[in-house]
A protein has these predicted regions:
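Glycine-rich anion-binding surface patch
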Residues: 1-98
């Protein structure tokens, strides 16, 4: 999954022969144990102008200065909603650093 690779890069994991994980090993989309450290890092890198919020059956990233990013998730899975919000946050964060 390309989104798992995106998350791994955000977490500074390298998909090289030197890494203990291969891309196919990334479990961000299926495991809270993998995903929660990402949520914690997002909380650390967020500034006073960014709000990262996840609600059951809905997740969104709010950039107070510029715009809102809403991710509508039609699922009863909190893991999936969180995963999609994390991916959108990272994509938005990457655009800001360009």
């Amino acid at each position: 999954m390309n989104d798992n690779k995106l998350i791994a890069e955000f977490m500074d994991l390298k998909s090289t022969g030197l890494s203990i994980y291969k891309e196919s090993d990334y479990k961000y989309h299926t495991s809270w144990d993998w995903l929660m450290p990402v949520v914690e890092k997002i909380d650390e890198v967020s500034d006073e102008n960014t709000l990262f919020k996840i609600e059951y059956n809905r997740a969104f990233v709010e950039d107070i200065e510029n715009y809102y990013i809403f991710i509508d998730v039609t699922t009863s899975s909190r893991l999936e909603a969180t995963y999609k919000a994390v991916v959108e946050f990272i994509k938005n964060n990457n655009l800001k650093t360009i």
